[in-house]
Amino acid sequence: MEIKVNFLDNLRLEAKFDDFTVTADQPIRYKGDGSAPSPFDYFLASSALCAAYFVKVY
């Protein structure tokens, strides 16, 4: 899988892979705009989703 990351305005980031686009931002307290989940929020959510998948399948 190829992932392309684009730097948007302020601290916003965009990752494109397959047919998906994911936008990330930092919270206002970290000088972001709070317009999207932070990269770390996505990391935690993806870990929980992986665990949930394996619980459901096995």
Language-model region placement:
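Extended beta-strand/beta-hairpin segments
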Residues: M1-A45, V55-Y58
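Alpha-helical metal-binding/catalytic segments enriched in His/Glu/Asp
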Residues: C50-A51
